[in-house]
Amino acid sequence: MKKTFNEFKDFIRNKEVAVVGIGISNIPLIHFLVKLGANVTAFDKKSEEALGEVAVEFKSKGIKLQLGENYLDNLEGFDVVFKTPSMRIDNPALVKAKESGAYITSEMEEFIKYCPAKIFGITGSDGKTTTTTLVYNILMTEGYKTWVGGNIGNPLFSNIEEMKEEDKVVLELSSFQLMTMKEEINCALVTNLSPNHLDIHKDMDEYVDAKKNIFKYQEVNDLLVLNRDNDITNSLVKEAKSRVMQFSRKEEIESGAYLNGDKLVLLGKEVCALEDIKLKGMHNVENLLAAFCLVSEDASIESMAKVATTFTGVEHRCEFVREIDGVKYYNDSIASSPTRTIAGLRAFEKPVILIAGGYDKHIPFEPLAEEGLDKIQALVLTGLTKNKIKDAFDKAMKDRGINIPIYMEDGFNEAIYRAKDIANEGDIITLSPACASFDMFPNFEVRGNKFKEIVNNL
């Protein structure tokens, strides 16, 4: 039996609550907990000066602050600790807090536990945001009051009292959010799995185990959607407790969704023609097939077809920016892993000038080099990983006897100017970094917006 939110309200009232991280998602959470009668202390590495008006507002509401480099030193003595998603549960400060009797949780765990509406959870290495947005749009088109959150949209926990049982909730869930998840998710989707975030996870096994939590606590009547074309996700079928639907662009699946020549098919019925889809690339065909499966019990073929033939994509995902002197510029800043960049490269009909490099997530670049050689006419590298990427391409070029020019640039701006200088009419330039942005930018959106700003001023 699903818990009611009144139970949480009774539980949290007058509790001593620590919230770790004063970021975009936690600010509404902190305000909400105060409104519910909790005594909140907010923890953050930033200084009071760096927090600015947020710190002033918090103090005016009686919210205590623990700030600075050693902000986690005083995490003991709390009844409840809300951790940030990327904070490992074996963090020494959390271990101490738990030993002192604290209940360790996160906003997403509590939201899923008490959410009255049907939840559609989406995870995977690539395609999460596009698929989440597709599912959201299909359910909206069908006429449901639909909420979207997790990695995209707004934090939802503070809106939970506005939600009704007949509403739908669509969540994009990262491996970090899922690491400690022990809640039932009614309709779960794993788009695909490949090495990612190995800077945070101990190894690939831990990363996959985190992703499995999206379906680990399902019941027999729930739904799990898996990618048959991906070896890892296909192997998860045998671990499912719920009903399973699969999707494929390589083989027919009568009880799922598949690409049949030039038609997208769900449960034997044509949804739309391949030529009518607005999204570029076969990876987006997979995203559509996955979305169709996930909403198959809640939306009509007509709603699916309408979205499939009108949806043009999400910002920073193979996003066309402009054409200058016959050269087309694309922003694929979301591509923070080699597999994501490979998918982006496959979307183009010809080899491109690729701008890549960034923060090191300790993911191998050899797969990108091996496939990328046929899809890249020139490579412009920048960021912390530029030498690692160059080494992978140098080896692949030597092994195959192929040579593509590689340019090494110190700055992000310089990389874009270099790409412009080497491009000729008819060429395509794409920013598809294969890395996270944290060496130069707070997130991929800021990186993508900077790229667009520079390109629009060329």
Swiss-Prot record:
The gene is murD. Pathway: Cell wall biogenesis; peptidoglycan biosynthesis. This is UDP-N-acetylmuramoylalanine--D-glutamate ligase. Cell wall formation. Catalyzes the addition of glutamate to the nucleotide precursor UDP-N-acetylmuramoyl-L-alanine (UMA). GO terms for biological process: cell division; cell wall organization; peptidoglycan biosynthetic process; regulation of cell shape. Belongs to the MurCDEF family. Keywords: ATP-binding, Cell cycle, Cell division, Cell shape, Cell wall biogenesis/degradation, Cytoplasm, Ligase, Nucleotide-binding, Peptidoglycan synthesis. It catalyses: UDP-N-acetyl-alpha-D-muramoyl-L-alanine + D-glutamate + ATP = UDP-N-acetyl-alpha-D-muramoyl-L-alanyl-D-glutamate + ADP + phosphate + H(+). It holds the Pfam family Mur_ligase_C. One of its GO terms (molecular function) is ATP binding. Gene3D superfamilies: Mur ligase, C-terminal domain, Mur-like, catalytic domain, NAD(P)-binding Rossmann-like Domain. ATP binds at G124, S125, D126, G127, K128, T129, T130. It is found in: Cytoplasm. Its EC number is 6.3.2.9.
